[in-house]
A protein has these predicted regions:
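Catalytic or ion-translocation cores adjacent to nucleophile or general acid/base/metal-coordination motifs
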Residues: 355-394, 425-543
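Active-site cores of enzymes that catalyze phosphoryl transfer or operate on phosphate-rich substrates
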Residues: 310, 314, 318-320, 330, ...
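Short amphipathic alpha-helical coiled-coil/interface segments
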Residues: 246, 371-375, 582
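Short, charged/polar micro-motifs that form catalytic or ligand-binding hotspots
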Residues: 9, 13, 76-79, 102-105, ...
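Long, positively charged leader/targeting segments at protein N-termini
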Residues: 338, 373-377, 413
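Structured, charged N-terminal subsegments at the starts of enzyme catalytic cores
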Residues: 248-357
């Protein structure tokens, strides 16, 4: 089903692009299913025809048959008419290599026929140079689509790719209405994602290039931006520095490779590659097991409700929640109401289990009022920053890390409601749709940022956002991700912004290693250093690269929006090519460090494990409604998962405080504690925390005497509804 209920649901123009994107995603998915079913049904005919053709062609290979007799011999095996029928059948059934089930997409024309006029007549599209052809087609359809014409022979044809041509232009050379419409929508979807076509006046779907530093603003800030990013104004100086780093690192790694037992050079395949042995799990010494057990035994049991109130007593995070329209509005016991609302959202249980009619701070009216007026992205972010900053002051957290290192990973949530802010992925969501909560965790175990992503979009689009948009006191400069977050463009952007990108690549040894000096001799690494970078691209775009990086650093443009616009599906711009070029060099520096330094690989793995373990705590907290997110709109999803991050941070902070107290207690008891053991402790435990509430087995005296409970008043019933 299309993930929207009708045009009446839309609150404005910004809703159209995501609806279009979601609709086409469903159409493409269904087209693939239909095409695969068709192929299965025709497989026997295709196999039979292929075998017949193979037999016919085998006569061509018989040396003993004279050339002039081949046709007669073939036709003696398969009559001419039969062979012609087989060839026709194969051409009908077999799919070309560039086929993307477009024929099945055209069959679903009826699903877009009613939607398209609303889109074309309501949204004002504009374009960058790369989107002019799409915009021309859009203007044409906005004029002609209301007509009943079956053929659009005067339509702009530049958008018709080779894979679409046979479905758009029929045998009589007419441009069909159905084929052209679906071809256009496919092109429009791609152009909107890349922002080659954009929505005029929209923040989310507008032109990111227009928001970059430019003109007098750029000239006034140019030198300041160069200095803040730590790059020279002369591109040759930057290239010389990169070349020296890369050359010296190649030589250092090559000199030590024969001593590196974890890495082998494999030349048996078509291309040489490195084989990297997996890291062995770290042994857990008896002293660490004993320390973990002693601390676990000392941690007092606590209800999650009390934990939130206790953390508020330490940090005052509830003070960050202020009334949406009356900043000075405060009521008695507001922290209690806020804690209840936070728990309702984070645990995914709703307000009902927390309502107490005899407690003023927990009445139905108070909790609904608190949720409506105090819970929003702004206040959640500020409250979370208080917890993260408090965690950073604790001695135990400082042993774990200094806050300079972080990891990014996604948690998947099924969304069993109709919403445009969700996407399909059978691996994670089965037959449902879902969202990804892409969150960032510091080496002190605190979560400092989170992004809600429809479905499972490429992580690489969002990985920089957590560093640039987070509002805590931490200053992470290095980030670890899984393979999905890695791309050469991201490596380039990280370097331009002064950050270190350290992903865990699934097959690092098979990656392309790039060199800057074509003639350099890197010994045993010569065979894998087969990529040749082109520094000229960097020189030509150097000032533009710094302008782009400076705009990101100053928050002029959102990272994910810009990355989408840079990732052209066809013919990347000169700027994109230059960033990718510098990314290749920095990716190679990373790869050389990765294969050479086991401690580096271990550090990446350790930080990623922290993020995954933190997800387990968040799952335990978000236990209601099968852990499914049932908010329909983006704001609601972001607020709920932001609340989950806040409550998870409260659990981590509470555990850290009490673990520190337990360590102090053990020292006072004369225990000798090993610093290395303390560094390997984790605050990501939750067995001592009651998140499920308490159950009462007492009855009111009236009921024990056989009387019924009083019925609700009408006003109460309306409030519940």
């Amino acid at each position: 089903k299309i993930p929207q209920c009708g045009m009446a649901e839309f609150s404005g123009v910004p809703a159209y692009p995501p609806v279009l994107d979601a609709m086409l995603a469903v159409i493409i998915r269904d087209a693939r299913k239909i095409g695969q079913k068709k192929r299965l049904r025709s497989l026997k005919d295709l196999d039979k025809s292929a075998l017949a053709l193979a037999s016919a062609c085998s006569y061509l290979l018989k040396e003993e048959t004279p050339d002039e007799s081949i046709r007669a011999e073939v036709f003696s095996y398969i009559p001419r008419q039969k062979l012609a029928e087989i060839i026709t059948l194969v051409r009908e059934i077999a799919r070309p290599s560039d086929d993307n089930f477009h024929e099945e997409m055209v069959e679903q024309y009826g699903r877009v026929r009613r939607f398209l006029p609303h889109l074309l007549n309501t949204v004002k599209f504009s374009s960058a140079p790369a989107g002019v052809t799409t915009l021309n087609a859009c203007d044409y359809l906005s004029r002609e689509f209301s007509s009943r014409r079956q053929f659009f022979d005067d339509a702009p044809t530049e958008i018709i790719s080779r894979s679409w041509k046979r479905l758009v232009i029929n045998k009589e050379k007419h441009i069909t209405r159905r084929g052209y419409t679906l071809c256009f929508l496919s092109k429009l979807q791609d152009s909107l994602r890349r922002r080659d076509v954009y929505v005029t006046g929209s923040n989310r779907w507008g032109d990111p290039r227009a928001r970059l530093l430019q003109g007098a603003d750029w000239q006034a800030n140019r030198i300041k931006v160069y200095r803040s990013l730590g790059h020279p104004t002369d591109p040759q100086e930057a290239i010389k520095s990169l070349g020296h780093q890369l050359d010296s690192r190649y030589r250092q790694v090559a000199a030590r490779l024969c001593e590196n037992e974890a890495v082998e050079l494999d030349v048996s395949g078509p291309k040489p590659r490195l084989t990297i042995s997996p890291l062995a799990s770290l042994d857990e010494p008896d002293s660490l097991k004993r320390l973990s057990k002693m601390i676990s035994d000392l941690l007092p049991p606590v209800d999650l409700t009390e934990l939130l109130l206790e953390i508020n007593a330490h940090t005052g995070f509830a003070d960050e929640f202020f009334h949406a329209s009356e900043a000075s509005a405060r009521v008695d016991d507001l922290p209690v109401s806020i804690s209840a609302v936070l728990m309702a959202e984070a645990c995914n249980i709703g307000l009902e289990p927390l309502i107490r009619s005899n407690v003023p701070a927990l009445t139905r009216h108070r909790l609904n009022w608190t949720k409506a007026n105090y819970l929003r992205a702004e206040t959640i972010t500020s409250a979370n920053a208080r917890l993260v900053d408090f965690q950073a002051t604790l001695p135990l957290a400082q042993i774990w890390g200094g806050g300079e290192v972080a990891s990014a990973d996604g948690m998947r949530f099924v969304t069993p409601v109709r919403t445009i802010n969700a996407g399909p992925n059978r691996k994670y969501f089965g037959n449902n749709r879902g969202i990804t909560w892409y969150n960032f965790v510091s080496d002190q175990y605190s979560g400092f940022h989170g992004i809600v992503i429809p479905g499972t979009l490429r992580d690489s689009i969002f990985v920089l956002e957590g560093l640039l948009e987070q509002e805590t006191g931490l200053n992470p400069t290095e980030i670890m991700t899984d393979t999905a977050g890695a791309s050469e463009l991201v490596f380039g952007l990280f370097w331009l912004l002064g950050y270190q990108f350290s992903p865990r690549l699934a097959d690092a040894g098979a990656s392309v290693f790039w060199r800057m000096d074509h003639d350099a001799d890197y010994g045993v690494l010569n065979d894998i250093a087969r990529g040749q970078s082109d520094p000229r691209k960097i020189v030509l775009q150097w000032d533009e690269m710094i302008r782009t990086a400076g705009s990101l650093k100053l928050g002029k443009v959102q990272v994910s929006v810009l990355v989408r616009s840079l990732l052209k599906s066809e013919r990347p711009s000169g700027l994109t090519q230059a960033i990718i070029e510098v990314g290749r060099i920095n990716k190679t520096l990373y790869l050389l460090n990765y294969i050479d330094d086991e401690d580096y690989r271990r550090r990446i793995l350790t930080q990623l494990n922290r993020g995954e373990s933190r997800h387990a705590v968040a799952r335990a907290i978000c236990h209601g409604q099968k852990g499914e997110i049932r908010k329909r709109y983006t704001d609601g999803q972001e607020d709920q998962l932001g609340t989950l991050g806040l409550v998870t941070n409260a659990v981590v902070l509470w555990n850290t405080i009490y673990m520190q107290a337990a360590l102090d207690h053990l020292r006072a008891q004369g225990e000798t504690l090993n610093d290395e053991d303390i560094a390997r402790l984790s605050p990501l435990c939750h067995g001592h925390i009651n998140m499920l509430g308490h159950y009462s087995f007492t009855l009111a005296e009236l009921v024990t005497k056989g009387h019924l409970r009083p019925l609700k008043e009408a006003s109460e019933a309306e409030n519940v509804a």
